[in-house]
UniProtKB/Swiss-Prot annotation:
GO terms of biological process kind: lipid A biosynthetic process
Stated role: Catalyzes the N-acylation of UDP-3-O-acylglucosamine using 3-hydroxyacyl-ACP as the acyl donor. Is involved in the biosynthesis of lipid A, a phosphorylated glycolipid that anchors the lipopolysaccharide to the outer membrane of the cell.
GO cellular component, one term: membrane
Protein name: UDP-3-O-acylglucosamine N-acyltransferase
SUPFAM superfamilies: Trimeric LpxA-like enzymes (SSF51161)
Keywords: Acyltransferase, Lipid A biosynthesis, Lipid biosynthesis, Lipid metabolism, Repeat, Transferase
Organism: Haemophilus influenzae (strain 86-028NP)
Protein's pathway: Bacterial outer membrane biogenesis; LPS lipid A biosynthesis
Family membership: Belongs to the transferase hexapeptide repeat family. LpxD subfamily.
CDD domains for this protein: LbH_LpxD
Catalysed reactions listed for this entry: a UDP-3-O-[(3R)-3-hydroxyacyl]-alpha-D-glucosamine + a (3R)-hydroxyacyl-[ACP] = a UDP-2-N,3-O-bis[(3R)-3-hydroxyacyl]-alpha-D-glucosamine + holo-[ACP] + H(+)
Active site: H242 (proton acceptor)
One term of GO molecular function: N-acyltransferase activity
Length: 341
């Protein structure tokens, strides 16, 4: 049966000021331009204010500045930040199917595993010896958890996650399907053309409240640990190489590649498809815009960009030609400066 939520109930969740019928109910959340009378919507960008007046939504989440753009008949939740309010309400109204409770008959649990209370382990999952799973941990179907790994309370691994041996994952983490944690780092020595593999004997240590997207790889350290601190969020298809250290509260968008022994500070924002060199540091509160190529340390907080924004092919060819000719132009300018002086 579809659950419904009243205006007043939702206002309590986000500390909102109410305008309209406190008893009106909605069932779910929809985009501003599509929401119907049984749905809640929100506005987080002023360029969409023109849509407010004719919105059919049962409830609108708006800021004080948005109110005058709404119909007098609209039921409003008035808040300081509608987008944050939306995030809180989306959690409260979340209808994502829950994982099956209990331990599946086909799960393989080795001797010496310590299970907390209310642990759930899905079909065909393998939990090797020495593993410690905290209270309310959820291990999805077909997951593998290697020897002596520790997973903190309330953490969930969706189906088909692989966690190698000696990994530590904190409490209340969420790891999406296909992610691999603790695989070997890319460590080799070259002996006259022959690659000699260096065993990767370090760990991966992940803090609390960390979320990791689907099909991301986090390599174990060569000697010391690869470290992901508390409250880090990492999107899909990222490569985190051995001995990377990511600071508290940093967000990493999809497709990012971080080379080995990189240190990323706290509260950084790393744009999608960025590539960051290893063996260097990025300070706290740095934003790297999408497709950034970072080859040197960053020592000052701020926003950094690289790359060429999209152009027509004709414009891009001109830009490329000019770029290739910069050295010659520079030499001619220096020659002119020398003559003038």
């Amino acid at each position: 049966m579809q659950k419904s939520y009243s205006l007043q109930e939702l206002a309590t969740q986000i500390g909102a000021t109410v305008r309209g019928n406190a008893d009106v109910v909605v069932e779910n959340i929809a985009p501003l331009d599509k929401a119907q009378s049984n749905q809640l919507t929100f506005i987080s960008n002023v360029k969409f204010r023109a849509l407010l007046k004719d919105s059919k939504a049962g409830i609108l989440v708006v800021s004080e500045e948005d109110v005058e753009h709404c119909s007098p008949e609209s039921n409003l939740l008035i808040v300081k930040d509608p987008y944050v309010a939306y995030a809180i309400l989306a959690q409260y109204m979340d209808s994502t199917p829950k994982a099956a409770q209990g331990i599946a008959k086909s799960a393989v649990i080795f001797d010496g595993v310590l299970l907390g209370e209310n642990v759930s382990i899905g079909a065909n999952a393998v939990i090797e010896e020495g593993v410690v799973l905290g209270d309310n941990v959820i291990i999805g179907a077909n997951c593998f958890v290697g020897k002596n790994t520790k997973i903190g309370s309330g953490t969930q691994l969706w189906a088909n996650v692989t966690v190698y041996h000696n990994v530590e994952i904190g409490a209340n983490c969420l790891i999406q399907s296909g992610t691999v944690i603790g695989s070997d780092g890319f460590g080799y020595a070259n002996d006259r053309g022959r690659w000699i593999k260096i065993p990767q004997v370090g760990q991966v240590i992940i803090g609390n409240n960390v979320e990791i997207g689907a099909n991301t790889c986090i390599d174990r350290g060569a000697l010391d640990a690869t470290i992901i601190e508390d409250n880090v969020i990492i999107d899909n298809l990222c490569q985190i190489a051995h001995n990377v250290h990511i600071g508290t509260g940093t967000a990493v968008a999809g497709g990012v590649i971080m080379a080995g022994s990189l240190t990323v500070g706290r509260y950084c924002l790393i744009g999608g498809a960025s590539v960051i060199n290893g063996h260097m540091e990025i300070c706290d509160k740095v934003t790297i815009t999408g497709m950034g190529m970072v080859m040197r340390p960053i020592t000052e907080p701020g926003v950094y960009s690289s790359g060429i924004p999209l152009q027509t092919n004709k414009e891009w060819r001109k830009t490329a030609a000019l770029t290739l000719g910069i050295d010659g132009i520079n030499k001619r300018l220096k020659a002119l400066e020398k003559k003038i002086s």
